[in-house]
Amino acid sequence: MVSKLSHLQVELLGALLESGLTKETLIKGLSEAEPYVLQSESQHAINALQTEKGESCPEIPNLPNGMGETRLSEDETSDDGEEFTPPIMKELENLSPEEAAHQKAVVERLLQEDPWRVAKMVKSYLQQHNIPQREVVDTTGLNQSHLSQHLNKGTPMKTQKRAALYTWYVRKQREVAQQFTHAGQGILTEEPMGDDLPTKKGRRNRFKWGPASQQILFQAYERQKNPSKEEREALVEECNRAECIQRGVSPSQAQGLGSNLVTEVRVYNWFANRRKEEAFRHKLAMDNFSGPQPTSAPPLTPHNSSSLQPPPALSPTKVHGVRYNQQPASEAESSSSNHHGNSSMVTTQTILHQVSPPGLEPSQNLLSTDTKLISAPGGTLPPVSTLTALHSLEQNPHALGQQTQNLIMASLPGVMAIGAGETSSLAPRFTNTGGSTLVIGLTSTQPQSVPVINSMGSSLTTLQPVQFSQQLHPSYQQPLMQQVQSHINQSPFMATMAQIQNPHALYGPKSEVAQYTHTGLLPQTMVITDTANLSALTNLTPTKQAFTSDSETHTDSGIHTPVSQAPAIHLQNQDTAIQHLQSGPRLTPSPAVSSSSLVLYQSSDSTNSHSQLLPSTHNVIETFISTQMASSTQ
């Protein structure tokens, strides 16, 4: 090192001073450039600068580690504005000269390496020995957040702070090595180097389970949630052995783990805490499972679920029975056959359960088997449950606690037909051979867009509107036996496609579907079929249907049904199998009756009579007709 500045160096210093820098700034910058240069070199440079300017400067005192005292910038000062002096630097004074020289040499070597690589090495050492960062912060005086960012993300850190961190790292390595070396002698404390340090805080490290011990304990918990004392002691030995192997020492030196030594009490507490956590999670799961969820419902489909809304065109002005309101309940008695067994009914209700609106109470479910018929201006109307679960209706003489509300229903008078796709009139266009087809006639004569629910399997998969603009022009002067020569050009089809998972769960196959007359009762229809039949909904070809009225009729199949004094409606299909609908006591189903049968529905003006839901044979469809329709056919 030259003792005299060259002409170029003098010019450079003069240019720096002329640029506005002060003498103190230059001295501090020169000191920060190389904080760990030898004192003689740093002092010679500063003395040369002062000699050039003709000023004198007091010498910087030497530290025990041979480093020059530096003046820190603002970000290196403490929170109260004082200069930052790492406590660990003062602790070096208590070391022997040989130990201090050794640590200084190792620290200087680490400072010359990549800071990010050294940071990862320090972090790995902390994890290996389960050392918390709090211990580093207490010893070095570094900021907790700054230290964490430097170790995890490589955030830059001042050289002097890194020197303090590396000094702690070197000293900790020596302490841990001494602990495991003299573990069997019992002469060492947890912090052998910290008791005599003036800045050491009297705070021991908290016990922390290592990853190796946790893996062993969780495996043991799967086998036995409440181990015995002998089993816990065996786990203690196994955990301590794993911790020693993790640290790279012999299992016989387990006492060197210090505060991380696993004991039987700690194992007992760990199992007790796990049992409490499991019981708490089980309680939460039971509360969530059994708790009421009035506003939640399973989504119909991952797509198009928001389209499940009543058709906007189905207003009370056009269809007087679309939405049910609070009306006086009329008790109804119904009989239906259930020859398919309970398992079929469960399958059907499971498939159709998602159709129920989420806001309905349990007594307002669309599939409720004890739902009563609701009185409406157009006559006594069957609820939706009678359309979806006909053979599950049971007699309930008690009045309803809560009447069904907000049920989307076909306006009556009208006709509902239920038959399989394998029919004489539907087979040419419908491709569904195993499912069921449900047609509900309505009174609206205006074209409108209605929703179509496509059900595949046990969940609703699509929901889309279908527009049917063609209309059927009623002619009440035409005879009832007149056949429609063109397609049934109904206005909107309220189509709900529900392919039953079990083809025989609700409605069995029928040879044909009853044929409807051109009476203006079927301008609006709801059809339940599968996806392949959607394109054929507007091309249905009607056949004939006869309505007669007498006091007593015998069917060709030998079924005899007595009729009361009240007028009755008869529906005849091409097989001349006639079912009678009357007002009277409940009828017993015939042995030949199945769940997919024809039913006529009629309401009477008598307050003592009850509407009947009658079973029939396979060849007849189920039809609901109100009193107005009955009077019009007489």
From Swiss-Prot:
UniProt region (Interaction with DNA), positions on chain: 133-135, 146-152, 158-161, 206-209, 266-268, 273-276
Gene Ontology cellular component terms for the protein in this record: nucleus; protein-containing complex
Tissues where the protein occurs: Expressed in liver and in oviduct.
Region of interest: Dimerization: 1-31
HNF-p1 domain segment(s): 1-32
Disulphides: none
Domain POU-specific atypical: 90-185
Annotated GO biological process: glucose homeostasis; insulin secretion; liver development; pancreas development; positive regulation of DNA-templated transcription; regulation of transcription by RNA polymerase II
Annotated region (Disordered), positions in chain: 50-85, 287-319
InterPro entries tied to this protein: HD (IPR001356), HNF-1 (IPR039066), HNF-1_N (IPR006899), HNF-1_POU (IPR044869), HNF1_dimer_N_dom_sf (IPR023219), HNF1a_C (IPR006898), HNF1b_C (IPR006897), HNF_P1 (IPR044866)
Gene3D superfamilies: Homeodomain-like, lambda repressor-like DNA-binding domains
GO molecular function annotation: DNA-binding transcription factor activity; DNA-binding transcription factor activity, RNA polymerase II-specific; RNA polymerase II cis-regulatory region sequence-specific DNA binding; transcription cis-regulatory region binding
Function, in words: Transcriptional activator that regulates the tissue specific expression of multiple genes, especially in pancreatic islet cells and in liver. May participate in the control of the hormone-dependent expression of the lysozyme gene in the oviduct and liver. In liver it could repress the gene while in oviduct it may act as an activator.
Protein name in UniProt: Hepatocyte nuclear factor 1-alpha
Gene: HNF1A
